[in-house]
């Protein structure tokens, strides 16, 4: 489908967006937004080097200055078929300048994400900008699965909507700049009506040490993808429905 779209609302230098487009079995238009203008410039260069004329990168704060608006109504955010994101973990000042620029992103969840932690704010932005049959994958700190207070209220609301297809727990110390364990939330709005549970994979033990970081081997990645795609539950310690 030549009109399919994928967005990364925290695109950094654009590598995740480029890989998503490379992995798509059909032509797809890419849209990225990056807060730092220098990094946004790098993303544009990266797109050119990878011969990706179909990628648009815009600079600006995704919360206070979202760049992609509905073409027919400038007061509504544009929605995408697919979203991929590895946003900055536990962002402290995400609320700066958002007054009057919420665009309904934080409504209907029973609470607002905490002022000093933007993890759920990213998730709400993604859910708002995903089409009603859209699919997304977002990397967030493991804490989003169990932290309390406002986040617990929001989490409960999201779970009740059956938008989350699966959660993949990753090893700690995988990403540069943080030792925090992360997880991938796989969102699929299309199948929500008939979804009974969430497919959980605990991939936190499948890795190899690489200097002072941990790294997923090809076989670890293959196991995650195969288990997820085929919904294999033969080893309940590794994967099961909850």
Identify the residue ranges that each predicted region occupies.
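Beta-strand segments within the central parallel beta-sheet cores of soluble alpha/beta enzyme folds
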Residues: 4-11, 31, 57-59, 199-201
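Short, well-ordered alpha-helices that flank and scaffold nucleotide-derived cofactor binding pockets
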Residues: 18-25, 45-48, 128
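Short acidic, glycine/serine/threonine-rich loops at helix termini
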Residues: 19, 42-45, 68-71, 94-98
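Class I S-adenosyl-L-methionine
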Residues: 1-29, 39
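Residues at the starts of beta-strands that form the adenosine-phosphate
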Residues: 27-31, 54, 135
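A conserved structural/catalytic subdomain of Rossmann-like adenosyl-cofactor enzymes
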Residues: 71-242
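S-adenosyl-L-methionine
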Residues: 44-77
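Conserved acidic E/D residue at the C-terminus of a beta-strand in Rossmann-like folds
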Residues: 34-35
